[in-house]
A protein has these predicted regions:
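Metal- and O2-centered redox machinery and metal/ROS homeostasis
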Residues: 2, 68-71, 77-78
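Acidic/histidine-rich alpha-helical segments that form the ligand environment
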Residues: 7-61
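Amphipathic alpha-helical coiled-coil segments
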Residues: 77-85
Length: 95
């Protein structure tokens, strides 16, 4: 398989790198990094949603099913990041 760069993800990662260089407070940095990770997750979620719709439209339920499993993993990761942020990291960053 050929590796393809994604300019959108590259931009999110570049932004995260810029923010991490600007933030000195460790707790604030942790919150910012979680926000960046969630930006990546949200992008991936939208892409999987689109790919699933296309696969279904093309009659490829086999592909749609595999993509749906990946989508569920991305959504679970996003929920975990939200839980971490809301239960601890954001509170510490606000202090």
């Amino acid at each position: 398989a050929k590796t393809v760069n994604c300019p959108a993800i590259d931009g999110i990662l570049e932004e995260a790198d810029d923010v991490s260089g600007d933030v000195e407070d460790k707790e604030v940095l942790d919150a910012a990094l979680i926000a960046s990770a969630q930006a990546v997750e949200h992008y991936e979620i939208t892409r999987y949603g689109t790919l699933i719709a296309w696969a279904k439209q093309l009659g490829r339920s086999d592909c749609a099913n595999v993509l749906a499993k990946n989508l569920k993993e991305e959504e679970a990761t996003d929920r975990k990041l939200t839980e971490i942020a809301e239960s601890k990291v954001n509170l510490q960053a606000a202090e």
